[in-house]
């Protein structure tokens, strides 16, 4: 029994993966985070399976993945990001964490916008790292939407802290792990 499962990172896109996602959606009763190949699998084989879910679902697409999930162009999404995101989250009763220069987190009714991340996060592995943060914080309180937003805020703060020591162009996503305790302490001290 796991309180939260994250899947999709590097698993590939296939009908077998779709069957696994479908099984989890219909049988797992806690929180399921779907990222990367998991999102692309839903886009290819049918996003409507989300309507059959028994669990809480967090989707973490970047704009390209979201365009594939919704069948809406990237340009259209960028023009109407809040409206399209809220409608999608409401329609599928999920939390959507739409990653871009800013990150929009919504459940369709309430939304957060994270603007504190640096461009240094726009590189391979950053989405996986963020999914890991969300995985770790998803059940810290009863407010799942807030927990996802807090994960994004921490992710942004990690990039800010790391940039004080490491040039933005040299920063590796794995470098962020060195700053987690410092950022968490800073947040706790700010209370």
Each model region followed by its residue ranges:
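Glycine-rich phosphate/dinucleotide-binding loop and adjoining beta-alpha-beta core of small-molecule
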Residues: 1-116, 185-186
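Hydrophobic alpha-helical scaffolding
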Residues: 10-11, 124, 137, 166, ...
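A short structural micro-motif
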Residues: 76, 154-157
